[in-house]
């Protein structure tokens, strides 16, 4: 049960930037975890420690975080001898060792790497599949397969096109299983490529950070129109619905929203007030089968969020607003800012805190969507996490790029392992029937 050794190293994420990988050894074997990284990061996220004083890797190295694992966290944990099955005790020990609320001393990327590896080791110690172990940690007796939200058109900070809104997603809510959902997602994705190629040419089929296409369009409505057409051609109208991640903090300027923010000469007269921006979203919801909108407003535009949430029945997801942080989530619940939490383990920096954030949101009647980051690795931990936490929904990119498929393929394996007992969230993705 005891940890024998911990070793961290610097590896690379899917954008070619350095990130932290941790190896943890017990008598059961070696357990490896890699930490993801975001592009559009909320200002309230736990601190991802980068080597800003070094010119190497454009000041994005993580050797300081690696050193903190190898020279501070590892010796302290080895001395403490906490069993790997005591996840909360291990995480709390590292949080106290850091001493800062945002994990700014050791780095959230250092602490999370160890936390992930400990979780994998704990599952092995109890001879449980990782998803079953996570369910045990969260107090769930059963598990559920999630609806995948495939990000098939990329804009915002994830792509070099003119689109302001960051992600246009498809959700196969009408599938009968996760396996069928993958088929639907793949077929819509390839039909979308054909639609984009026909209308904009082959170079418009370049993909963004998360595997989605990045056609050089500026009209966000056009992105939705392309999705609707691809869904229709694939034969899944009514079975595949649409989601969006607006990442509106990226185009928030001087209290207004600039949908031409990538243009240095953007005309201020065209910027939209929060109410005008809300009307754009309402028009989209009316015209297209949208079931989920993430980050429709700036992370601190607290007045705008509750108005939109109260005016629509769809899922309004807080990401930059809540950053998987219990204090931010508590405030959002109090003012009824949104009705769904986007759960990113690296925003808060430990498994225990991620589970606590999830349970807090679910207790308030919110949905929870587990998420990857745009800078990913081949680590597929979040696939087991979403099944174990029973959230019913996951977004981890398009059905393209191996670091994205690593998660989807693991979910296929889990569904196969569950066999006839596997349950797919489907139309109940916001509140899965466990």
UniProtKB/Swiss-Prot annotation:
Binding-site residues for Mg(2+), renumbered to this chain? 245, 294, 319
Where can this protein be found? Answer: Cytoplasm
Look up the record and name the pathway of this protein. Answer: Carbohydrate degradation; glycolysis; pyruvate from D-glyceraldehyde 3-phosphate: step 4/5
The active site of this protein is located at: 210, 344
Q: Does the keyword Lyase apply?
A: yes
Enzyme class name? lyase
Supply the SUPFAM superfamilies for this chain.
Enolase C-terminal domain-like, Enolase N-terminal domain-like
GO biological process, alphabetically ordered: glycolytic process
Q: What is its main location?
A: cytoplasm
Q: Name one Pfam family in it.
A: Enolase_C
Q: Which reaction does it catalyse?
A: (2R)-2-phosphoglycerate = phosphoenolpyruvate + H2O
Q: Cofactor stoichiometry and binding?
A: Mg(2+) is required for catalysis and for stabilizing the dimer.
Family per record: Belongs to the enolase family.
Q: How does it assemble?
A: Homodimer.
Q: What is this protein called?
A: Enolase
List the source organism.
Answer: Schistosoma japonicum
